[in-house]
Amino acid sequence: MSHALRAFFHVDLSPSIYVDSASQGNFTLPALKHAARLAAYFAATIFIGGLLAPPLFWAGQWLTARGLFPFLANSDFERFFHRAVLFAAVALLWPLLRLSGVRSTDDLGLAPNSLWRRDLLAGFLLSTIPLLCCGALFIAFHIYSLRHVIAWTAIGKIVAASIAVSPIEEIFFRGVGLGLLLKTSYQYLAILTTSAIFSIVHFLKAPEHTSTIVTWTSGLNSIAHSFSQFADPILLGSAFITLFVLGLILADARVLTCSLWLPIGLHAGWIFAAGAFNRVAHRGILDLPWLGPNLLVGIVPLGIAGLTWLIMRNWLKYGAPGKL
């Protein structure tokens, strides 16, 4: 590991990162260390992703020009930007874990789960069924209407996204991010912090065709344009609060089970249900703050998320002995 990278991430580790709750004077220092490392990690990930996006885009164009990977020809720069950020996140993950003293999943508060299939399926059903039932009621009351033509290919992409995105995001946010902050023994602050980060990161999405001409600074331009959606404070607030609550539910599921399988199932279910419903039905106008552009934004979806949370906790308490 280079000296520069060590200098960027390095914060001196105390002999023990577990803090006696009775010692308030020594409590905040480890928490700040892990929070600072995590903040540096996310900032570096986004910045390096912005720098890598242009050469990654040019490489894709070079390959398609030679008849290789023709599907890349239909991908705009923003798609390459998101892949570059993901690549940077993976590349910086190992130094983050090493500098945080993590040598195994035990250090992140994760334990083997022999019932992982049950938790994965339960999570998927707990998030999918209430959301789709809500969507069915919207159609019945003519708030939404069925599309005349259903793009089954698009639904296939939603299925693929729910399978791929949910484990990736859960590993980063609830696995690594929450795991590092839980090492401070300050559980509630750890959950709130990672849920806020989870919500904020989802706003790092520039409008399509932001960079029609790609230059070396196009990635940084995409980062800057991500803040353009802040112009609509009601939509911003509705989306942030909903994502924050979803983050709380996912973090709670992870803490209660000491495993990522239940939150992965929940996450995959929300992606699938919201995405598939939007491909099957549509509505003409927004009705903020009650309903947003999809089933995951607004006060009503927030209530559905709360219902899922309540059902999940009761299932862990009564239907999954030993979990709660």
PLM region descriptions:
Residues 168-218, 252-259:
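Membrane-interface helix/loop boundary segments of multi-pass membrane proteins
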Residues 201-202, 267-271:
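Acidic helix/loop microenvironments that form the catalytic cleft of cell-wall polysaccharide enzymes
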Residues 161, 165, 178, 182, ...:
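Hydrophobic transmembrane alpha-helices
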Residues 119, 184-191, 270-274:
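Small-residue-rich segments of transmembrane alpha-helices in multi-pass membrane proteins
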Residues 120, 124, 128, 159, ...:
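Residue-level signature of the transmembrane alpha-helical core
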Residues 1-117, 128, 132-135, 139-144, ...:
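N-terminal, membrane-interfacial amphipathic/helix-forming hydrophobic leader that caps
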Residues 137-172, 176:
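Hydrophobic alpha-helical segments and helix pairs
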Residues 148-159, 224-238:
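Juxtamembrane helix-entry segments on the extracytoplasmic side of multipass membrane proteins
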